[in-house]
């Protein structure tokens, strides 16, 4: 008579060949996706941090952002784009992150930014220092006037040290930000 008590030996179930193939297929698919995402980010994108408070409230000091380096190969920056650039192409500088606001002519008068004679919708705060934009600036081909969303705490195209930004000095369009302080992750508007 057999004891029906504890049994420490159980028959092992064999894993079928089909199940193994399915598992490896999923693992390969996930690994390939991660690899392709890394290639896209490394070669077409860039990551950097915002330096300073010039883009508040849109972006905060130290906030991590992702830059699309490929977009401006196919098209040109548009008014409202948030871009990263090296001022005057200075490779030793940190990336400046500012908003493109201009068309052909830019001027700041009585604290208001005018683009082609019309009040700009991108800067609503009264600008205390017009800088070089006190006199009308006529932009050349592939030149852009870039300003911080917090213009009274921003070194931007109004500064003689920076001036209009040439398209060739732009790293790309900032398109996504990570969580910082009270701000969650999301697309840059």
Each predicted region: which residue ranges?
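Beta-strand-rich cores of mature extracytoplasmic or soluble domains
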Residues: 133-189
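PP2C/PPM family metal-dependent serine/threonine protein phosphatase catalytic domain
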Residues: 111, 115-131
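Structural motif
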Residues: 63, 78-82, 104, 143, ...
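Mid-length scaffold segments of soluble, non-membrane domains
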Residues: 93-115
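Extracellular/periplasmic catalytic domains that process cell-envelope and extracellular macromolecules
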Residues: 58, 76, 106-107, 137-140
């Amino acid at each position: 008579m057999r004891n029906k008590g504890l049994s420490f030996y159980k028959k092992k179930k064999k894993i079928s060949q089909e199940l193994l193939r399915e598992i490896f297929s999923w693992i390969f698919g996930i690994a390939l996706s991660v690899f392709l995402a890394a290639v896209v980010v490394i070669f077409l994108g860039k990551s950097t941090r915002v330096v300073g408070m010039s883009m508040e409230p849109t972006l905060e000091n130290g906030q991590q952002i992702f830059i699309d380096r490929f977009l401006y190969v196919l098209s040109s920056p548009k008014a409202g784009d948030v871009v990263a650039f090296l001022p005057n192409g200075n490779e030793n500088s940190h990336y400046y992150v500012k908003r493109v606001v201009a068309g052909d002519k830019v001027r700041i008068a009585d604290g208001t930014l005018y683009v082609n004679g019309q009040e700009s919708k991108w800067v609503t705060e009264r600008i205390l220092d017009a800088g070089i934009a006190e006199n009308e600036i006529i932009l050349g081909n592939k030149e852009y006037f870039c300003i911080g969303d917090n213009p009274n705490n921003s070194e931007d195209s109004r500064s003689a040290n920076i001036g209009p930004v040439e398209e060739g000095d732009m790293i790309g369009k900032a398109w996504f930000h990570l969580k910082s302080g009270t701000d969650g992750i999301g697309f840059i508007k």
